[in-house]
Amino acid sequence: MHAYVYKSQLKPDTYVYVPRRDDFSALPAPLLTSLGALTFVLDVALDAQRRLAQADPDKVRSDMSERGFYLQVPPSVASLMPRHYD
């Protein structure tokens, strides 16, 4: 699986992983609005050997398959998020 990673310009240390470059159609409108402009930062192959600095590759692959995106937020923010966003 391949991922394209974008950085939020409004939310510090917040990134969105999507399976197709520049395709944000799977992101809910309120989330997309709250993130503001998204700046492309990386494309990455999420194979079994891939390690990511701040995210679990299995969770990234799972969310991208099931939801169409993966949202990476700073640990301090993640602890405050409702359970259904895990």
Curated annotation (Swiss-Prot):
SUPFAM superfamilies: YcgL-like (SSF160191). Pfam families: YcgL. Residues 1-85 form the YcgL domain. This is YcgL domain-containing protein Smlt4554. It comes from Stenotrophomonas maltophilia (strain K279a).
